[in-house]
């Protein structure tokens, strides 16, 4: 979250840079964050060391290196369901991206793809890149789409357009773009096979055509952050877990898996 999300479109970035050059960082801050929304906590993916634990916490101890959905601050308080230990062979700075990995992982799980599936990822920001890596790791055939050549240059399987990729009959399209344009969802319906699944992870409008979904019997799912338990006060604040026989992968497991290196 934060300034990067507020300035996600190129026109806003140009305005922000000009304001920064002319009037300084405080002017940019005041323009992006009006006074009526302060105080504001920035960020949701952090790593650090446990200083102290509360009553009833038995899984963590002072000195443990952990990742969490805590804000970007020197000190944060986080429920144990939203923390996981950092493996000894993982750098603490690298681990700070874990929550982003869990968002990518949850989106991929919702796509219900597997070995040999054809997956297209639209939007190659950091979460889109992580979805691609995870999908490749499970043995899927992955194509990434993004208009930014700096992003597509990172892999031979990344393209600036669907026409360039020449991809059809896709099993699942995962949209990780952040845009006000309706193009991502329109593109997804065109390249998806009959009965395919479209998963929306990014912030996009959903002005869908009924006919596009009707004739192909497409399934649309909007991914919720890093999975079951998110925004549930019983889970996030009171620390009550879900029964494993009903919910196999919760927010905690999605946090835990990306911390382990292959």
What is each residue range found by the language model?
Residues 91-163:
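Mid-domain Rossmann-like dinucleotide-binding core that forms the NAD(H)/NADP(H) cofactor-binding site
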Residues 211-249:
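Rossmann-fold dehydrogenase core element
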Residues 253-259:
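Conserved small/polar residues in nucleotide/adenosyl-binding loops
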Residues 27-38, 45-69:
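A glycine-/small-residue-rich N-terminal strand-loop-strand element
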Residues 69-80:
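A structural motif shared across PLP-dependent enzymes of the aminotransferase-like
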Residues 1-46:
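N-terminal glycine-rich beta->alpha transition that marks the start or flank
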Residues 156-221:
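Glycine-rich cofactor phosphate-binding loops and adjacent beta1-alpha1 units
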């Amino acid at each position: 979250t934060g300034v990067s999300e507020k300035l996600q479109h190129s026109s806003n970035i140009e305005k922000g840079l000009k304001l920064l050059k002319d009037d300084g960082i405080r002017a940019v801050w005041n323009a992006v964050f009006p006074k009526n929304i302060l105080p504001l906590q920035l960020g949701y993916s952090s790593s650090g060391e446990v200083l102290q634990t509360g009553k009833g916490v038995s899984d963590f101890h002072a000195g443990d290196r952990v990742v969490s959905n805590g804000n970007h601050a020197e000190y944060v308080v986080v429920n144990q369901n939203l923390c996981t230990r950092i493996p000894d062979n993982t750098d603490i700075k690298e681990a700070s991206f874990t929550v982003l990995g869990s968002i990518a992982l949850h989106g991929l799980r919702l796509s219900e793809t597997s070995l040999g599936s054809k997956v297209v990822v639209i939007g190659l920001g950091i979460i889109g890149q992580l979805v691609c890596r995870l999908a490749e790791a499970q043995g899927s055939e992955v194509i990434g789409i993004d208009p930014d050549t700096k992003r597509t240059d990172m892999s031979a399987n990344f393209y600036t357009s669907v026409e360039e990729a020449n991809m059809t009959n896709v099993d699942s399209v995962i949209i990780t773009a952040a845009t006000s344009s309706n193009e991502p969802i329109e593109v997804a319906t065109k390249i998806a096979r009959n009965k395919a699944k479209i998963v929306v992870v990014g912030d996009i409008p959903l002005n869908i055509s009924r006919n596009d979904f009707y004739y192909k019997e497409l399934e649309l799912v909007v991914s919720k952050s890093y999975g079951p338990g998110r925004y549930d006060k019983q889970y996030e604040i009171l620390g009550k877990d879900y029964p494993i026989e009903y919910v196999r992968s919760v927010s905690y497991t999605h946090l835990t898996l990306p911390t382990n290196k292959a």
